[in-house]
C-alpha cells in the first residue's frame, strides 16, 4: 500500500503506488462524469483546442467569431503566459476573476478522454504548473486583491479538478511526480476555501461549501477528508433553509443565483 511505502520514506515509490491506486479506484462513483462512453460537444472541443495555443476560454468573453466558432483571447506574451492580461476594451472585473477559474481545463480533459491525444494533458500540465508557480497557495486569510485565491475562484477550481483528474489519470504523462504536485495543490485549494468562507449567506458561500463537501465525498483518501465532509455537510444543512426567503425565492433576489444555488444543492445530493 502507498501508506506503508510512505512510512519507510520511499516517497517516489509511495507516489507510484498512489498513482496505481487512483488508476484502479473502483469504490468511488463520481456521478458528474462518464468515462465509459465519453462525449464532447463541439463547443467544448473548440475550447480545448484553442487552449493548446494559450487562447483560454473565459466565460462570457470572446475576442471574435470566426467560421461559426468563438475565438478567445490569447494570453501569450514574450513566449510566456501573461496571467495578468486583460484586453484593453474590457473594463469588467469579471474577466480577471473568471480567468482564474480555469474554465478551459475540464474541456481539455474531456477532449483527452474522447480523442486519447496526449497533447491535451501535456497542455494542461504545462499551463497548470505555470499557474501554480506564479500563484503559490496563500496561508490564512486572503485579501480581495488576491483575486486568484478569493471567493468563487478556488471553489470552482476544486469542483472542476475532481472531474478533471479521472479523465487524465490513465495517461502516461500523468506521472507519480505530477500526481504528487496535483494532490498537494488540491489539498491547498480546499484548505484555502475553508480559511476564507464568505459569511454573507450568498450564492458564493454555497459554492464554497459545495466544493468542500464534494472534496470530502469524492476524495476521501486525504487525511482531512473527514473534516471536509463533516464541516461541509453541517453548513449545507444550515444553508438549505438560510438561502431562501419564506416565499421560496433565493435571498439575493436574482433568478440566476436562485438556479445556481438549487443546482449546487442538487449536485451534492447526486
Task: Show which residues each predicted segment covers.
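Aromatic-lined, polymer-binding surfaces characteristic
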Residues: 79-80, 85-270
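Helix-centric, low-specificity signal for extended rod-like, repetitive segments
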Residues: 16-18, 48, 94, 150
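Short, functional "switch" segments adjacent to catalytic/cofactor/reactive centers
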Residues: 25-87
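Membrane-proximal, glycine/serine-rich, low-complexity loop/turn segments characteristic
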Residues: 10, 18-21, 28
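Short, solvent-exposed helix-helix connector turns and helix-capping sites enriched
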Residues: 7-11, 54, 117
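Generic alpha-helix initiation/capping and coil-helix boundary signal
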Residues: 8, 41-44, 208-209, 225
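Short, small-residue-biased leader/transition segments that mark boundaries at the very start
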Residues: 2-6
Amino acid at each position: 500500500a502507498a501508506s506503508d511505502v510512505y512510512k519507510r520514506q520511499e516517497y517516489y515509490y509511495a507516489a507510484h503506488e498512489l498513482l496505481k491506486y487512483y488508476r484502479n479506484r473502483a469504490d468511488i462513483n463520481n456521478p458528474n462524469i462518464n468515462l465509459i462512453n465519453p462525449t464532447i460537444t463541439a463547443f467544448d472541443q473548440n475550447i480545448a483546442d484553442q487552449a493548446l495555443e494559450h487562447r483560454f476560454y473565459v466565460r462570457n468573453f470572446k475576442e471574435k467569431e470566426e467560421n461559426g466558432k468563438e475565438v478567445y483571447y490569447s494570453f501569450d506574451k514574450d513566449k510566456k503566459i501573461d496571467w495578468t492580461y486583460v484586453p484593453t476594451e474590457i473594463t469588467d472585473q469579471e474577466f480577471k476573476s473568471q480567468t482564474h477559474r480555469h474554465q478551459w481545463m475540464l474541456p481539455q480533459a474531456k477532449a483527452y478522454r474522447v480523442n486519447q491525444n496526449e497533447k491535451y494533458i501535456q497542455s494542461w500540465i504545462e499551463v497548470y504548473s505555470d499557474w501554480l508557480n506564479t500563484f503559490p497557495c496563500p496561508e490564512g486569510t486572503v485579501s480581495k486583491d488576491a483575486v486568484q485565491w478569493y471567493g468563487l475562484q478556488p471553489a470552482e477550481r476544486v469542483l472542476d479538478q475532481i472531474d478533471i483528474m479521472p479523465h487524465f489519470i490513465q495517461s502516461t504523462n500523468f506521472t507519480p511526480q505530477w500526481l504528487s504536485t496535483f494532490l498537494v495543490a488540491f489539498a491547498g485549494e480546499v484548505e484555502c476555501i475553508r480559511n476564507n468562507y464568505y459569511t454573507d449567506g450568498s450564492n458564493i458561500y454555497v459554492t464554497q461549501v459545495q466544493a468542500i463537501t464534494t472534496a470530502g465525498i469524492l476524495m476521501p483518501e486525504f487525511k482531512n477528508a473527514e473534516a471536509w465532509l463533516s464541516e461541509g455537510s453541517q453548513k449545507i444543512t444550515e444553508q438549505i433553509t438560510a438561502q431562501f426567503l419564506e416565499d421560496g425565492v433565493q435571498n439575493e433576489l436574482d433568478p440566476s443565483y436562485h438556479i445556481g444555488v438549487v443546482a449546487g444543492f442538487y449536485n451534492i445530493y447526486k
